[in-house]
């Protein structure tokens, strides 16, 4: 009974007050970099920048980069070369394939990966390697229809290839023409992933979606020899005209002299 009474008494005893222990506050965050600039020497402050500004600067630099075609005259027409993240088209009956191979050679020599969607099945690996193409950095896709070619180009652009070339071959192009919406989707994919897209076709296909459009006129042969001596084909002369560009006034043209490789 005594034990039970003791337990009952303990239930009704006044409760002890809890002591509130103050919790120390964390130290204030360091001052923003912008607030520190006035306290630094001018020579040091001029060399500092914020992380956000650095990201914006790198993005601008990336957009301004180009991939050269290695034809100086053509690069000058395009303002330095093929713009990254943009679609450029070269159409016509001229020697378009020479520009295609030269551009792939330039990209692979810079250490970049290139995808070639070869609808016309025109690539000769041995000749391409002799022209400076690093075949280890080239993915060669050989579609059967034009729809497959456009789909393959979009997949390559979305998976990290810095240069994608879609060559439609000689007319007639195999398969039906794709709708304009497919070109719009392809252009947006390239812009989103920073991929440079070069479309080579016997006639204009991309419409208003391309950043620039070149037209290659039919080449004219150049011969060596005269009189009774046999004439030897020395090369071809081709005129390339800038038909459209969103930042450069179109209408200019240049002549290219392409030699015959023995």
Ranges and model annotations:
Residues 93, 102, 110-177, 181:
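Conserved inter-motif catalytic segment of the P-loop NTP-binding fold
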Residues 70, 77-81, 85, 126, ...:
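Surface-exposed loop/turn and secondary-structure junction residues enriched for glycine/proline
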Residues 187-262:
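Phosphate-binding/switch region of NTP-binding enzymes
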Residues 82, 157, 189-191:
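Solvent-exposed alpha-helices and their adjacent loops that cap or buttress functional pockets
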